[in-house]
Amino acid sequence: MTDVPAVRIRNFCIIAHIDHGKSTLADRLLQATGTVEDRKMKEQFLDNMDLERERGITIKLQAARMNYTAKDGQQYVLNLIDTPGHVDFSYEVSRSLVACEGALLVVDASQGVEAQTLANVYLALENNLEIIPVLNKIDLPGAEPERVIGEIEEIIGLDCSGAILASAKEGLGIDEILEAVVERIPPPPNTINERLRALIFDSYYDSYRGVIVYFRVMDGTVRKGDRIHLMASGKEFEIDELGVLSPTQKQVEELHAGEVGYLGAAIRAVADARVGDTITLSKAKAESPLPGYAEANPMVYCGMFPIDADQFEDLREALEKLELNDAALHYEPETSSAMGFGFRCGFLGLLHMEIVQERLEREYNLDLIITAPSVVYKVITLKGEELYIDNPSRLPSPNDRQRIEEPYVQVEMITPETYVGSLMELSQNRRGIFKDMKYLAQGRTTLTYELPLAEVVTDFFDQMKSRSRGYASMEYHLIGYRENPLVKLDIMINGDPVDSLAMIVHRDKAYNVGRAMAEKLKELIPRHQFKVPIQASIGSKVIASEHIPALRKDVLAKCYGGDISRKKKLLQKQAKGKKRMKSVGTVDVPQEAFMAVLRLDQS
């Protein structure tokens, strides 16, 4: 099965925006090459997770090996490495691009180029990939291939003279795509005689076989039974299973330079086989690891606490298992006076956070309280030390710090002209700095803003979608830290600060956010037997407060007429009881209150 020379191997991926038909195209390629029999075919064959099929997005990376007989009569091996299209998963895209020599750029012929497609195309160009433009969905009545070709040439600067018109749904243009892959994408370099180097681009945990590693052999040959050395973690293992993905796993004896496959080596901890690590042989180690991989750094943090304290260990186990499949998920234990024991988790972005939360609840049956997301701030202390703070409650006091810096991102939005004004207003309200605006063909515009990440992670995406009636798309990337007058806003309920509600805000916005927060909590916290004050404060200065009135029992109900002093005595007794209750009573804060921060109307 592996006797195809490197000259006849093609490694490629598909770059596309959500909903532009990437998974359907992958399905058609699998069918056309006979890799998957028609009777076993189901939609979105490579999207394994239920969540992926439901949301119609690709989250985890998949790979498939196809045998294809081209028009020149030669037998070729095509390795398709499927990539996610969402901005949060750009690290997954970057590692699949490193394993390829070419890419199919799939663009919806009725919608045109979207912002996230751009980001991935730039990544592909940086990795010197050969890009083949494919216009999908040409069977739709609204398809305008000429306009879209113009857009690709104008925005990306790609030559589209060889663009392929296709409809994955109808099966049009599939043969042309396969021929183009063979003719235009270069074969992998023939480095079979060099020392083994292979790139890990994905791994997942199998409860029977341990960690299964997906990899691309860059140099040399790997055989079943080899003892391998992982260059970043320094661990060594013996390969007991080696195979290719077509798309189900098929075992083979050896894989050569240019091939894509999987291995099992009784690896127990995912941390030992990190994505992006280089595999080499223990007895003949490569001199240097493969370049171009960076650790995925979380940009957004939040607290996760089990509603039932007994589930803490279950949550720990669930996170450990998820981390196995998700190189970018970070977590550490944390305690909160309001919520008890839980974890502080780091994510790549909001969609990533939602998906992890949904998987914990769905696959592991956990009931969770999630605190509002926050970003990583850089604090310069008086001694000149740099601290990175991902939890507002850990911020040093104003007397111990010189300044606070927050992460900024460059946001690119592509939108129909009609909504430009509304999106500019949204960006200005979120402390955005206008950078650029370009008019594209057919009444579409690109807007470029620099925004604090903290303003983007709450509900910027939802607001952008609602203001543009779903037509705008956005992409963002980190551009560094900048100093701003930021303050820590504490929320106190019944005189006690609630650490999970603390947040870092811009000084100019502090009053409005504090006011809105106090009002929202007043609505959400149920009434108690005693009066509950809610205060928003900066340091010791209270900037907004609300009161939840007490529930009162009518202690005078049994006094008909009679002496006023009797009534006073009963009222004083009640007041004394309330006072005592207030000092020892705890306030029950419902889960909705912790998510209220997300829904404050700031726009």
Swiss-Prot record:
Keyword Hydrolase attributed:
yes
Report domain tr-type G positions.
7-189
Entry's Gene Ontology cellular component terms = plasma membrane
Record-linked CDD domains: EF4_II, EF4_III, LepA, lepA_C
Q: Which UniProt keywords apply?
A: Cell inner membrane, Cell membrane, GTP-binding, Hydrolase, Membrane, Nucleotide-binding, Protein biosynthesis
PROSITE patterns registered for this protein in UniProt = G_TR_1, G_TR_2
Q: Which Pfam families match?
A: EFG_C (PF00679), GTP_EFTU (PF00009), GTP_EFTU_D2 (PF03144), LepA_C (PF06421)
SS bonds (residue pairs): none
Q: Which GO terms describe its biological process?
A: positive regulation of translation; translation
Q: Is-annotated flag, keyword Amino-acid biosynthesis?
A: no
Q: Where in the cell is it found?
A: Cell inner membrane
Amino-acid positions noted as binding GTP in the UniProt annotation, renumbered to this chain: D19, H20, G21, K22, S23, T24, N136, K137, I138, D139
Looking up SUPFAM superfamilies in the UniProt record yields: EF-G C-terminal domain-like (SSF54980), P-loop containing nucleoside triphosphate hydrolases (SSF52540)
State the SMART domains in the record.
Answer: EFG_C
| EC number(s) reported in the record | 3.6.5.n1
Catalytic reactions on record: GTP + H2O = GDP + phosphate + H(+)
Q: Which family does it belong to?
A: Belongs to the TRAFAC class translation factor GTPase superfamily. Classic translation factor GTPase family. LepA subfamily.
Q: What function is annotated for this protein? A: Required for accurate and efficient protein synthesis under certain stress conditions. May act as a fidelity factor of the translation reaction, by catalyzing a one-codon backward translocation of tRNAs on improperly translocated ribosomes. Back-translocation proceeds from a post-translocation (POST) complex to a pre-translocation (PRE) complex, thus giving elongation factor G a second chance to translocate the tRNAs correctly. Binds to ribosomes in a GTP-dependent manner.
Q: Which PANTHER family match?
A: TRANSLATION FACTOR GUF1 HOMOLOG, CHLOROPLASTIC, TRANSLATION FACTOR GUF1-RELATED
This chain belongs to the protein called Elongation factor 4
